[in-house]
A protein has these predicted regions:
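Short, well-formed alpha-helical segments that are part of the catalytic scaffolds
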Residues: 12-25
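Acidic helix N-cap motif at the loop->helix transition within catalytic regions
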Residues: 14-17, 40-50, 88, 92
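A conserved acidic beta->alpha catalytic loop
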Residues: 22, 29, 37-46, 62, ...
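Glycine-rich, basic loop-to-helix element that forms the pyrophosphate-binding segment
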Residues: 59-75, 96, 140
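Short aromatic/hydrophobic "clamp" motif used to bind/position activated sugar donors
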Residues: 80
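Conserved donor NDP-sugar-binding/catalytic core segment of glycosyltransferases
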Residues: 92-125
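Conserved nucleotide-sugar donor-binding catalytic segment
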Residues: 112, 130-217
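C-terminal subregions of glycosyltransferases and related glycan-biosynthesis enzymes
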Residues: 202-311
Length: 311
């Protein structure tokens, strides 16, 4: 079997049916599907009971990393493809993964091409296109390209996943970024440029909206790099910090624009020297200005609210 598709889920009754329907529509047949329920309390399990072709595993709520690890420990495919239970694949997705693996002589790590959407009708604009790939000796070699490899984009050799130790079981987010960095030196990284293979759903309960947990996960990336937990030593340090700060920069800005000022400033301070080393002057100068502007705006809005109450 070429692929094991592993789907962690937690209270996704609203979306998981569309996810599974997109799997059933695949034009490539050599795969198994494992869904790991992470302690759902809504109707997710009821929906899963209607899909006998899916292998369902259950655990107490431990987070998506632990759920993916459980699925990976029970799978039999040569490659593992992760899919989140609120996202969808296109009919050609697994076929595209298989072709990329074939033409590149079985690379260790392949990354999907995603399309962000809010409403499923937006997916109608996505069409199958000829295969185009960007090839690198390893993931660290992409550090100047800005390629992000989230869990739902990962297709990797099962043996490589096992050797890495899998996702952290800590109850934090950015566990996928941590794994990608630990996989930084595996043999050959392939980024799919076309066709689009993943429909990444945007909604109010997206993990990316949980700022405290993302903050803890982002701090883990910084601390892990400082502690030498990522491979490559001093020779690959600049590449690693480019990849770490690829995550810290946008998140620090998002923090200060959503009133998590302490989070944003802490990330700015902790990565300041790294940004100097990689010559990120626009960020080093721009972040304080953005933080100041939003701080003034919040203060002004608060004053206006007080004045309105006094009228």
């Amino acid at each position: 079997m070429l692929f094991s598709v592993i789907i962690p889920t937690y209270n996704r009754a609203r979306y998981i049916r569309a996810t599974l329907d997109s799997l059933q529509a695949q034009e490539f047949a050599d795969y198994e599907t494992i869904v790991v329920d992470d302690g759902s309390t809504d109707g997710t399990l009821s929906i899963l009971s209607e899909t006998p072709w899916v292998r369902v595993l259950r655990q107490e709520n431990k987070g998506p990393g632990a759920a993916r690890n459980l699925g990976a420990s029970q799978c039999s495919g040569q490659y593992i493809a992760f899919l989140d239970s609120d996202d969808v694949w296109f009919p050609w997705t697994l076929k595209t993964f298989a072709e990329a693996i074939r033409v590149q002589n079985e690379p260790d790590l392949v990354a999907a091409k995603l399309f962000e959407f809010y409403h499923e009708r937006e997916l109608e604009s996505v069409k199958e296109e000829p295969l185009k790939l960007d090839i690198f000796p390893d993931y660290y070699s992409t550090s100047r390209m800005g390629y992000f490899v989230g869990a739902c984009m990962m297709v990797l050799r099962k043996s490589v996943f096992e050797e890495s130790g899998g996702f952290t079981n800590a109850p934090i987010y950015a566990e996928d970024c941590d794994l990608a960095l630990r996989l930084g030196l595996v043999r050959r990284f392939v980024q799919i440029l076309s066709p689009v293979t993943l429909g990444y759903r945007q909604h109010q309960t997206n993990a990316r909206r949980n700022y405290p947990r993302i903050y803890r996960g982002t701090l883990n990336l910084i601390d892990s790099e400082r502690a030498g937990r990522y491979p490559g030593g001093e020779a690959r340090k600049t590449q690693r910090i480019r990849l770490v700060t690829l995550h810290t920069r946008p998140f620090s800005v998002a923090c200060v624009t959503h009133s998590y000022h302490r989070f944003g400033w802490t990330l700015y301070r902790k990565t300041f020297c790294w940004h100097v080393r990689t010559l990120r002057w626009k960020y080093l100068i721009g972040f304080p200005l953005v933080a100041l502007w939003h701080g003034i705006r919040v203060q002004r809005n608060a004053q206006e609210a007080v004045q309105t109450q006094q009228l």
